[in-house]
Amino acid sequence: MTPTSPSPDLLPTLPDVRGKLLRGAELAPYTWFRVGGPADALFLPADEEDLEAFLKALDPAIPVTPLGVGSNLIVRDGGIPGIVIRLMGKYWGEIEALDGITLTARAGALDLAVAKAAAANGITGLEFLSGIPGSLGGATRTNAGCYGSELRDRLVALHGFRRDGSRVAYRGPGKPGALPEAHFSYRHTDLPDDLIVTRLILEGTGAGDPEAISADIAALQARRAQTQPIKEKTSGSTFANPDPPGTPDQRSAWKLIDAAGCRGLKVGGAQVSPLHCNFLINTGDATAADLEALGELVRARVLENSGVELRWEVRRMGRVQRV
């Protein structure tokens, strides 16, 4: 998570691991846009102990970038320098109910899987996660939310590692305890940049009937399928709404984009979705540069039309490819 790139002689000296360490791994298959260049190396740790040992042994000059399921991300065409760490597989997707209202889940668990696990255990209040594409770790980084709820609303505690391999933990906003408090705002968190989230404890709003909760999730999924381009190569919402939820006369990013005449707008193989214009889609042959250029064009047109400067919600990272 530093801007410096390692010299070529650093990567051959990477620590031994029990998971997988792939040099020069293409990252496009790991992102929902299916674009982007390679990582100098991609590390898929077997478990927390494997991740901890790797970070402690890794040369501090080598940058580290955590990657979730790539649902809210544009990896630039020049790839990502240093080590990309992805928490994936059965271990990192584990979810366990702790009691009738709380559960714990590892950072690689899909948001939808967490919502369904909560439903199966009769825990209400986590249904909104079914509308968030991606994994729990990524949702934490952006304080993801929808349908009137955000991750911070349900967070009891989170655990993870700093870049040097030290273990850290934070309590959720307003939660009691001796741990330092994690601070969140609309689509933002003040957690350290080098933090790799590994596990969370979430609290529902109460107990309910599993079948009724599951029916609510199914209804939210059906609504999402009707209003968002979920079958396309896309991500979550491209831009954050200018106003936080609950703001009187809240302005929506998609309405501003539509009013600026951007619905269906194209740059190369990238397009503003005709179905929901706060989504960019890869029509088949887009590059990361196409997507980013289209996003900037949308921002410019919205600024000219309404005077509002939209803020990217999709993360963009990596090196710009030199032509």
Swiss-Prot record:
EC number: 1.3.1.98
Biased composition (Polar residues): 227-240
Cellular location(s): Cytoplasm
Keywords: Cell cycle, Cell division, Cell shape, Cell wall biogenesis/degradation, Cytoplasm, FAD, Flavoprotein, NADP, Oxidoreductase, Peptidoglycan synthesis
Functional description taken from the UniProt entry: Cell wall formation.
Obligatory cofactor(s): FAD
Enzyme class at the top of the EC tree: oxidoreductase
Active site: R187, S237, E313
Positions of region (Disordered): 227-251
Record keyword Flavoprotein present: yes
Coiled-coil ranges (or none): none
Gene Ontology BP terms: cell division; cell wall organization; peptidoglycan biosynthetic process; regulation of cell shape
Catalytic activity field: UDP-N-acetyl-alpha-D-muramate + NADP(+) = UDP-N-acetyl-3-O-(1-carboxyvinyl)-alpha-D-glucosamine + NADPH + H(+)
Stretches assigned to the FAD-binding PCMH-type domain: 35-207
Protein family membership: Belongs to the MurB family.
Pfam families: FAD_binding_4, MurB_C
Pathway: Cell wall biogenesis; peptidoglycan biosynthesis
GO molecular function: FAD binding; UDP-N-acetylmuramate dehydrogenase activity
One GO CC term on file: cytosol
Protein's name in the database: UDP-N-acetylenolpyruvoylglucosamine reductase
Gene: murB
